[in-house]
Amino acid sequence: MKKVLSLIFLSLFTLFLVACGGKKEEATKNEGETKKEARVIKVTTKFVDDEQTAKSLVKVVEAINKRSNGSLELQLFTSGTLPIGKDGMEQVANGSDWILVDGVNFLGDYVPDYNAVTGPMLYQSFEEYLRMVKTPLVQDLNAQALEKGIKVLSLDWLFGFRNIEAKKAIKTPEDMKGLKLRVPTSQLYTFTIEAMGGNPVAMPYPDTYAALQQGVIDGLEGSILSFYGTKQYENVKEYSLTRHLLGVSAVCISKKCWDSLTDEERTIIQEEFDKGAEDNLTETEKLEDEYAQKLKDNGVTFHEVDAEAFNKAVAPVYDKFPKWTPGIYDKIMENLTQIREDIKNGK
């Protein structure tokens, strides 16, 4: 009897050990799955931490990382600390795990017609532009960008109309003569400032502050938010309201990276950048008046300009791009005319 009981006890003990071993193995497996490394995607931008676009991007990155439950780790690099502009777009097009938040003009290096859509003196309001980017015309450009390895997540990251910040007041194109003005490395900006009468000097935005101090340039062009956020008012005190271009950033991710993500990850990224664009616009609209007053408090003088004279001056810019699709300007104006009519009629 004792022998039988011993055998039963031994069998039960063996089963207990097997069960414990299985649970331990399952726990180890689950732990391994939990510790799966997150997909790291770098997000780079020229905007400094104090600028609204950078603040909105912080929210976007945090939301994506939280919603992905550890499968994604977006890392934000502001102030041009990692490649931006032309170099940043190359990272995207070449398939890096990379998101660039920078001017739409850098998309123009791959799909030239983007520069036509964001050309000088086109828009009178943010709403006109935001409706334009939803037209079939612009959606077709996004499809062309995809063929070049660039997935356009958003064209909606507005930061205000661009004006002239300089050491002298500007009223007419004649006042621009001889002025060395910083511009992004972009033919669109170069041709626009030349047409307006200035002398464009291409350089990365983070270098602008020192260039003003050292007299390398006499001023720059940019939005009220950028002018205040980067403290350029410490070097120049005249702000002339040319409104020659609309300040807007594109959000672009590598197609290779995008295609390798899960459907859920793609949805999270798209939704959060869309929300971020709305947040950025809302805050931008609120801050423009506030920052204008702060600039005045810091000794900056605002100047209205001869808009008609500048409109005439920049008209030839649209003939300087042989790579643009023939008739693209007419198509843009056709869409813009309809957009203005719809806005007027409350549609």
Language-model segments: residues:
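N-terminal secretory/targeting leader peptides
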Residues: 21-127, 137, 145-347
